[in-house]
Every structure is written in structure tokens, then in C-alpha cells.
Amino acid sequence: MNRLGRLSLPLRPQVCLLCQTQATMSSPLAGWQAVRSMATVRQRRQAARMVLSSNVDKSSLKQGRSKRDRAGPWSGMNQTEARLRDAPRSRSRAALKRSGDSEDDKQKPDSPLYKALKMQTALAPIPYGRRTAIKNKIAEVSSFDQFPLLPVVRHSISSQALSRTGDIVPTPIQRLAIPQLLKDPIPKRTSKDVSDHEPNFEQYLLAAETGSGKTLAYLIPLIDSLKRMEVEDKEFEKWEAEQKAKEREEKLKNRAFDIEPEEAPLSDAGRPRVIILVPTSELVAQVGAKVKALSHTVKYRSGMISSNLTPRRIKSILFNPSGIDILVATPHLLASIAKTDPYVLSRVSHLVLDEADSLMDRSFLPTTTEIIEKSASSLHKLILCSATIPRSLDNLLRKRYPDIRRLTTPNLHAIPRRVQLGVVDIQRDPYRGNRSLACADVIWSIGKAGDTEPTHPFLAQAGPKVKKILVFVNEREEADEVAQFLRSKGIDAQSFSRDSSSRKQEELLEEFTESPIPPTAEEIMLAKNKRRQDNSIPFVFPEQQNKPGAERGLPNTKVLVTTDIASRGIDTIAVKTVILYHVPHNTIDFIHRLGRLGRMGKRGRAVVLVGKKDRKDVVKEVREGMFRGQALI
């Protein structure tokens, strides 16, 4: 108001409203740039098949909500915010926490332990309280005699399966799995009790570390169940034959002049009782050999088929007139046979998916699912086993088989402490970035060094021990190149990949998978006489002289350069050293490649070559986790 008591008119602003609006508005380009920069800074989530699950041992059954958690009729009375329909809602605290934008999370310092592995989200922990409980449970079992096995099956364990090992003691996964798999299957439910989509058979997941005896853990109960079913089948066949004889007599009395063709009995040819599926033909040969070895004492008919065999050979094995009890095969080959002959899967009572993380992956999942669905009518038990459980497999099992029984060992997703990991920096002198030269130098130093482990006295008398080394590369093309370079440096190296011929693959695997058999007394005497003759002759023959142009070689050392084809399931019990030519892509590959060592309680040594572009922090944390004996989390 002015001096006269009147209202004064508002003054015009010095700046127009349009200019004020433009000055206060934020630039859209700046916001777009901020969003774009944040999207590039934030790391992408890895694929589910490359990330291990954190809840392997937890059941999929949902617990019912308590009465306190349920919303009552007056639950909406005490609201502190107005929840209008058309008004945009702000993001909840849970959504902010999932996105990583929460203010509370910014204040929390990152844990220094396993920081790089958490950035990769390669592994997640299983509660160590659960691991301790499993250790206490399996400590009560110390012998195979505590299992309710048939006497002939128990005798075959010591005479065939574990004849080359000193102590015949069950491993942790065998202590967990054998009692559970020996239980009688659940009774068949009627259509009223179960829906069409719910499986009508028992499901088991065997999750244990590499080299822990998972094959024997499911093979022993299967053979025991097979022999028990044979007794039941003989009794049923005897009763069925008596019933058919009575019916035939009644028909002859009532219709003496009628001629009716009799139905031919259904043969057991091409109708196995137990099917073991593995992803590769190399695993078919390995698992099939174990099944065949046990059949020498426990009488049953077994066979193995893979793409390495001819169609005529496959037909003679599968459709043998005497029948077949246990079949080891790959999924694609078995599915193609089942399309032409559906009766192949009509009598399957036990189905095993060995290396389930590969068989339930995208490449095998449609074929594996088809086999499970076709054999579901007669199936009693479905068994999945693997050393690594990716998040994708865990989610799939919780969705399809929520009632699956999870049998996990305390050392799941861990590398044994008896395996030592060394690191070689190839950027330093004398390598200067030459990875192949560093690999050759490591092999020469290992080959020239003496053997630290005590050898069998008879093997020491027979001759020098041959050291066997595995070299893992990431690319298939580099296997031949690295093997050729090592041969140029005087190292006996061979390449093993999918491009190799089947006969060459079998010969190479036999050298690196079979442990040496103790020699007989005659072989020891021959070796002693030969060594005595060589030392007594004072002459040097022309063929024994070193030629001037001859290259020196590394004696008593064999090297196999391979890809991940030999990292899964291959029982390389004769290998004591593994060299990682490249740093693995994820922790799953670390576990499988280093899992070729330390099998069945033996020691091993691994060397990883680290270059300029490799993740040294990941290698460091893997090494620290191996030293502590913890899971790679």
C-alpha cells in the first residue's frame, strides 16, 4: 500500500516469462548423456549358464504364509501415503535396492574378499552351516558294508570298481547318494492324485566336486535295483505263464475247431532297463567301461553307443536278441533311434543324466526333455549329477521338478586344497609376452624335476616314471599350433580336440586316463637284467650316438594340448600337472579344468599363464580360495 492507503499495481518484471522458463528448464541432452553414461558404467549381468547357483541345497517347496503375514480386512486403514490411481508411483525401496541406486547400499563398503569374482557374478555361496551339517552326517558312514547292498554287488566294489585303489572307503557323495537311491520308489499314483504336467517319478540331484566318485555313487544303487527287479520279473513271468496256460486250456475246451493266432511275446531286445546319458562320445567310452567292468561279477547285459560306431555296430549292440539291461548313450543318437523305434524307451525304470549342466543346456535341452517325456510312463527314478550347478539349471529344476531331492557335498564348487596353483607372468623376462615359450619353459622345468610323490617299489624297478601333463587352451584352432610349437622344442606333445579322429582320441585318452598297473615278478626280472646289460657293455653303438644335427628332447614326459572337451568328466587319474595356457572365461571353467587334478585323494599341481590383458585379480582370488579350501564365491 502507498501513503494514500491505496493498493499499488504490480511492477513488470525486467525479464520476460519465456526467458525465465528457458533458463530454469534442464537441457534434454544433458539428461540423455547422463543416462547413457550410467548404462555404460554399469556392468552387464552374465548369462545364467555361466553363473553358478547359490541355492543348490535348498528345496523348491514353497513354505505356506503364516496367519500374521496375511492381510486382514482392516489392513488398508493405516496408510501413511496416498495411493491415487492416476498418480505416478515412486519406486519402492526394494526396487531401488535391486537396481543398486539405494542410498543405504552406497554407504556399505565392499568386502575385499572375492571382489573380482563378485563383479563377474561367477559363483555364489552355499551356507557353510549347511556344509557343516552334511559333514557331521556323512562322518557316521565309513564302509560300504553299512549300505543294504546285495552280497554280489558289495563284492564287485572291491574286486572290480575299486581294485586299483588302496583304501576301499566311500566318498562323501557316495555316503549321501547310495542310501537315498537304494530306497524303494514311490508307489504309482492314479490320475486323480496327479496332474498331467506333474512328474510321476522320483527325482534326485547329485551335486559334488570333481573327482569325487559320482559315477560309482549312482551306478552301485542302479545295479542293485536291477538285480532285485530281475528276481521280481522272474516271479511275475512265472505267474503270467501259468495264467496264460490256464486261459489256453479253457479256449481249447470251448473252441476246439477255432484257429486263433497266438500273440508273440514281447522281446527284451532294444528295451533297456537303465539308460545313462552323457554329452560326449569320450564319456560314453569311459562310463561304458566302468559299467562293463562291474558286469564281470554282477551278471547283467550292458552296451554303449556313440557316433564313433557304425550303424551296423549300433544295431547289433542295442537290438541284441538276448536283450540289454544298461545302455550308455548320447542324447541325440538315442532320440534319433527312438523316433524310428519307440519301444526303445518303453521299459526304462532308471534314467541318469551325467554332466547335467551340459545336458540341460540350450543345445541338449529339447532332446533331453523329449527322452524324459517318452520314458516317463515306466520311469521310477530320474537322477541328475554334476560338479557345477549353474543358475540356469537351478531355475529350470525348481520350475520343472520342485520336489527334487538335492544331495550336495560340503566341498561343492570348491577346488581341493591338495591341488596347488602357480602363476607365471608372461610379460616378464625372458618371455616378453610369448605365451608358447612360457608354456614350453614350464614343461621343461617340470620334466627335469624329480618326482616328489613316493612311487610303488615295483614300478621303480621296472623303469623311469612317465610324467603326463595337460595343457588347456580356449580355442580349438590353437590346440594344433601349441602342440606343434612344443614339438619343435623337443617335447612329446599331441593335440586333442573335436577335429581329431575317433581312433586317435581313444589312443590319447588311454594314455592319460589309465593308471599304471604294478608289474609282475617276471617283468621286474626282465627290467633288471636289461638295465644290468646296458650298464655292463662299455661300448657305444653307432645307433646310440647323438647325431650332430639331432635336437635334444625331454625324456619321460608326455603332453596333451586340449580344449574343454577333456575338462568334463574325463577321469585323468594319471595326470599330476595341468597348465592353463589361457585364463578361463569364468569360474565354472576354472573348476572343471583344475578338476582334472586331485582326483580320488591324490595331489596335483596347476600352472596358469597370465598375460597383459588377463584378469590377474580373478586368478589371485581363485588361488586364495583354493588355499583356504573354500568355494569359489
Swiss-Prot record:
Region: Disordered; residue ranges are 50-115
| Residues binding ATP, per UniProt | 208-215
Q: Which PROSITE patterns match?
A: HELICASE_ATP_BIND_1, HELICASE_CTER, Q_MOTIF
Comp. bias (Basic and acidic residues):
98-109
According to the UniProt entry, which residue ranges have a biased composition of type Polar residues?
52-63
Enumerate the UniProt keywords alphabetically.
Answer: ATP-binding, Helicase, Hydrolase, Mitochondrion, Nucleotide-binding, RNA-binding, Transit peptide
The record's CDD domains line, in alphabetical order, gives: DEADc_MRH4, SF2_C_DEAD
Transit peptide as recorded in UniProt: 1-38
Does 4Fe-4S appear among the keywords?
A: no
Read off the InterPro entries from this record. DEAD/DEAH_box_helicase_dom, Helicase_ATP-bd, Helicase_C-like, P-loop_NTPase
Q: Which Pfam families match?
A: DEAD, Helicase_C
Q: What catalytic reaction does the record list?
A: ATP + H2O = ADP + phosphate + H(+)
Function summary: ATP-binding RNA helicase involved in mitochondrial RNA metabolism. Required for maintenance of mitochondrial DNA.
Q: Which family does it belong to?
A: Belongs to the DEAD box helicase family. MRH4 subfamily.
Kindly provide the name given to this protein in its UniProt entry.
ATP-dependent RNA helicase mrh4, mitochondrial
